């Protein structure tokens, strides 16, 4: 549906949220520009890590996240079918004890129930499939999303076909708010927009004291995360995924970055060993990431991760060979239930998106649209509002506000200061 009022929209951040929103808002008739500080789009976690298109069991303690995942998954697959990677198997396993010897954070009954929220779920015999140390395991029809060049090339074609200009190597220093516009300040100058969308992964350009203004007192941490890269020596026509739940357990995901058959690239992550630090500021997490090198990863991280995966999948290292590592800094909500859906809000004409799971880009966009329409109404509609009072754009409140607010001084020779009767009575 195209909108009655065409707005100039500037989007900062060329990851999943930024690129998807650019396409959706262009379809609605807005003029859209995209700004990415790196040399290419999808240079963060969404373009480099193997990413699950969640059906929900990953979050057994957050029904809200599971419901959001299932709702968003259907819409995502309908929107980007060419980027959906279907799996031979997607195993969710319930571990006996995590890396610290602790039991799972959920009971086996609860774990089974959340897996069977997906109607195609089937129970798997762990030992018959080469696994150990598991209470139970289930196979779901759960895909992942393509990454790397396959993802970038798909979106470059889509953005180009839509006529959306992408500013690369464009670091946005600040967003300047005025009464009717927002200006994006880069090293090349200023760009004027009606609406700016901050899709930087909640890492920059945030309003001062925004935590105090939000309707919920949310906790945020910035985590330095890495993934170990492996090559499958026995590639199949379709890839597989394997995760142990719920606590400090390992996970294996495919990292599909081409359309070639028999994909070999996988990543190994862990609930604790590949989350290397949690910080109050993104910059602190980036400092840790920048300090890492292959020697540090090989000596301090890789042995723990391989010990953990082989506790549950003894044949892993016989099939997969280590090829390196990659890292990123991610914003994460601090919640007891591990809530992971996105949050979207607007302040001063800037819409900010706190990222959730990749499929949440669809639902985040659905929230952005009414926020943009509300901005259009406030700035370009026929009704204005001030402190709860509404009036039309033809009202003198709007057209002559300065003039009607300019009041005469006390005692000034002015009709509004006349006291004629009192003066006549006094004179007599």
From Swiss-Prot:
- Is Oxidoreductase tagged as a keyword? yes
**Has keyword Transmembrane helix?**
no
> What class does this enzyme belong to in the EC scheme?
oxidoreductase
Q: What is its EC number?
A: 1.14.13.-
Q: Show the Pfam families listed in the entry.
A: DAO
Describe the outcome of a gene knockout.
Leads to the loss of kojic acid production. Leads to the declined expression of kap6.
List this protein's GO terms for biological process: kojic acid biosynthetic process
- Point out the signal peptide segment: none
Instruction: Supply the alphabetized keyword list.
Output: FAD, Flavoprotein, Monooxygenase, Oxidoreductase
Q: Which GO terms describe its cellular component?
A: cytoplasm
Reported cofactor(s): FAD
Sequence positions that bind FAD = 52-60, 328-329
What biotechnological purpose does this protein serve?
Kojic acid can be used for several biotechnological applications, including use as an antibiotic, as an additive to prevent browning of food materials, and as an antioxidant. Kojic acid is also interesting as an inhibitor of tyrosinase. Finally, kojic acid has also been shown to have strong nematicidal activity.
InterPro entries found in the cross-reference section: FAD-dep_OxRdtase (IPR006076), FAD/NAD-bd_sf (IPR036188)
- GO molecular function annotations of the record: monooxygenase activity
Important for catalytic activity, annotated site positions: 421
Up-regulation conditions: Expression is controlled by the kojic acid gene cluster transcription factor kojR. Expression is also positively regulated by the secondary metabolism general regulator laeA. Expression is negatively regulated by the transcription factor kpeA. Nitrogen deficiency increases the expression. Expression is also regulated by the kojic acid related proteins kap1, kap2 and kap6.
State the family it belongs to: Belongs to the aromatic-ring hydroxylase family.
Function according to Swiss-Prot or TrEMBL: Probable FAD-dependent monooxygenase; part of the gene cluster that mediates the biosynthesis of 5-hydroxy-2-hydroxymethyl-1,4-pyrone, also know as kojic acid, a by-product in the fermentation process of malting rice that acts as a chelation agent. Glucose might be converted to kojic acid by a combination of dehydrogenase and dehydratase reactions involving kojA and probably additional enzymes. Improves the antioxidant capacity via the accumulation of kojic acid that is also a strong oxidant.
Could you identify this protein by its name?
Answer: Probable FAD-dependent monooxygenase kojA
Q: What lineage, starting at the top, does this entry show? A: Eukaryota, Fungi, Dikarya, Ascomycota, Pezizomycotina
């Amino acid at each position: 549906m195209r909108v009655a009022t065409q707005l100039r929209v500037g989007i900062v951040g060329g990851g999943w949220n930024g690129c998807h929103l650019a396409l959706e808002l262009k379809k609605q008739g807005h003029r859209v520009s995209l700004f990415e500080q790196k040399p290419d789009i999808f240079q963060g976690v969404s373009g480099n890590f193997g990413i699950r298109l969640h059906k929900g069991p990953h979050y057994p303690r957050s029904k809200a996240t599971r419901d959001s995942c299932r709702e968003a998954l259907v819409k995502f697959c309908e929107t980007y079918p060419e980027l959906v990677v279907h799996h031979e198997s997607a195993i969710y396993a319930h571990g006996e004890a995590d890396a610290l010897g602790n039991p799972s954070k959920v009971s086996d009954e609860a774990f089974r129930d959340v897996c069977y929220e997906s109607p195609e779920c089937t129970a798997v015999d762990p030992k018959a499939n080469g696994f150990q140390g598991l209470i139970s395991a289930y196979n779901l029809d759960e895909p992942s999303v393509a990454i790397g060049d396959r993802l970038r090339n798909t979106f470059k074609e889509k953005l180009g076909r839509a006529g959306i200009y992408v500013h690369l190597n464009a670091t946005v220093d600040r967003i300047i708010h005025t009464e009717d516009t927002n200006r994006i300040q880069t090293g090349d100058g200023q760009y004027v927009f009606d609406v700016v969308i901050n899709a930087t992964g909640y890492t920059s350009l945030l309003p001062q004291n925004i935590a105090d203004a939000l309707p919920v007192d949310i906790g945020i941490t910035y985590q330095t995360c890495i993934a170990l890269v492996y090559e499958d020596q026995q590639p199949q026509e379709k890839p597989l995924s394997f995760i142990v739940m719920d606590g400090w357990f390992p996970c294996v995901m495919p990292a599909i970055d081409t359309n070639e058959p028999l994909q070999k690239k996988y990543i190994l992550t862990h609930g604790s060993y590949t989350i290397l630090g949690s910080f109050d500021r993104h910059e602190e997490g980036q400092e840790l990431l920048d300090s890492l090198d292959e020697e540090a990863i090989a000596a301090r991280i890789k042995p723990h991760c391989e010990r953990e995966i082989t506790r549950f999948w003894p044949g892993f290292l016989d099939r997969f060979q280590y090829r390196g590592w990659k890292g990123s800094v991610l914003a994460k909500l601090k919640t007891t239930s591990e809530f992971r859906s996105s949050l979207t809000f607007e302040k001063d004409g800037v819409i900010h998106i706190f990222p959730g799971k990749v499929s949440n880009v669809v639902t985040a966009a659905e929230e952005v649209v009414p926020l943009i329409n509300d901005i259009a109404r406030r700035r370009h509609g026929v009704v204005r509002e001030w402190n709860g009072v509404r009036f039309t754009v033809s009202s003198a409140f709007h057209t002559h506000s300065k003039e009607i607010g300019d009041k005469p001084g006390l005692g000034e020779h002015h009709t509004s200061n006349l006291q004629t009767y009192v003066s006549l009575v006094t004179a007599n």
